[in-house]
Amino acid sequence: MAETKFIFVTGGVASSLGKGIISASIGKLLQARGYKITIQKFDPYINVSPGTLNPQEHGECYITIDGHEADLDLGHYERFTDIKTTRWNTFTTGRIYSEVIEKERRGEYLGKTVQVIPHITDEIKRKMKRGSTKEKFDYVITEIGGTVGDIEGLPFLEAIRQLKWELGNRAVCVHLTYVPYLSAAGELKTKPTQHSVKQLQSLGIQPDCLVLRAEHKLSQGLCKKVASFCNVRPDCVVQSLDVPSIYEVPIKMQEQGLDTAILSLTGEPIGETPALAPWRSFVERRKNAKKVVNIGLVGKYDLQDAYKSIHESLSQCGTYCDCKVKLHFINSEKITDETAADVLRGMDGYVICPGVGPRGFEGKIAAAKYCRENNLVTLGIGLGMQVMAVECARTLLGYTDASSYEMDDKTTHRIVDIMEDLKSVGNPFGTMRRGNYDTVIEKGTKAYEAYGEEKITERHYHRYELNVVEYRDELEKAGLKCSGVHPESGLVDIVEFTACDWYVGAIYEPQYSSTVLHPSPLVMEFVKQVSNRKG
């Protein structure tokens, strides 16, 4: 392909319709046809990154391979396409404004009055077009967060308007809207979609494709009506109905010809329709799984999206283990040594989830103690691994006040501490270990059994580390094996309790690197152990 083509995905009527899934599905379908693609997300909020947003309100903060904090939709992009994301796949209003203000302070605008148009919109356009200038992608798919009509999103839509005018048929807009069903009337209503498109048109953008999100199937007549009233070709109107699994969406979009419509609009040959054989095999295997395993997620956020990547990784691995993973949220604030048996009852395995702050910390320790003492299949992630170490120090070493410096800076036994060379750094965000780091795994351990190799690379997102200088030897003598370490610093990345069948903790976040076709080896081994234990 001579020149990069651009696909802009916008949303209307309501939020949370699944723009991220549609963007990822488009990427998957074009990738299957041999095109080199990338997907990026522009979020209208003024936070520079999602790292400071409350997971209870916004969902998880996803981490790219270079350690950038990103929206959870980037997880969908990676899980669908197997393409690793970086800081260049995620932007916010706050980040763009910050960069423009920095340029103004450096005098790069030569005394001009800095305004939303052209300076902010030009910066947005530069970010949107980076994929065509740096890495030469065939298609750059850009998702715009929020809905049409939000005041925060206007600069992004203006940038799209300008790019569509400048690029001609090299730029298309895919607009996702909601078609509500009125049960009293027994009708699907297209008027909200018409108004959403009209609002987009009033901003100078004519959508080229419409994806109609609905709970009931639309008739051909309704689809033609929408096409006619919205100035869109009939073959460019597709439906996105509720499906049992998000991984069926690319197949449904392909069946309705969304990828061929985009190719036609951008002047590319249609060619033969890809079979998507591995993907279809995964979906069928998922449908045919009969066995059900129940896994408890021990955490403090009851919003499902707060642990989105963990949910998806466990679900993917369940498919490859021919079982359906049923997840149960267990509020760690309700767990004590006295209540653990009742609160944790009935699960086949447990994940002690990552998190920050003291709320729910003691409950996680009680959960870890119960799981270890009862030889239950358990995976600790991030803070979950730190909890495992603190619990062993309290119960097995007798250090009753043992804790993490994050939770108790007065403790005399800092089992988990901030790295020594980072204690003088004033900005807490400057002390975080984020992104890809190597880990060397000791042979003969459960971690090695999971990965099958000595050196691995996983994504980290944490500030505190196991205090290896003071406590590693004692913990290992008590049975907590440090089976994976960073090769240069000696920092402990993986622990496992040798007396248990499978009780493993990782300081890194294995769920971030788990995709549909390449699931996380550690999460896979955990689900396999859970399934085998159930029989």
Predicted stretch roles:
Residues 1-323, 333-349, 356-357, 364-370, ...:
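Flexible phosphate-sensing "switch/lid" loops adjacent to ATP/NTP-binding sites
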Residues 17-20, 24-28, 32, 343-439, ...:
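Cysteine-nucleophile active-site neighborhood
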Residues 57-65, 243-247, 352, 373-379, ...:
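Short beta-alpha connecting loops at secondary-structure transitions
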Residues 182-189, 386-395, 497:
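Glycine-rich, charge-decorated loop segments at or immediately adjacent to ligand/cofactor-binding or catalytic sites
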Residues 235-242, 328, 485-488:
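Beta-strand->loop->alpha-helix junctions that form or flank phosphate-binding loops
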Residues 281-285, 296, 422-460, 467, ...:
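Glycine-rich phosphate/pyrophosphate-binding loop
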Residues 442-535:
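C-terminal and late-domain segments of enzyme folds
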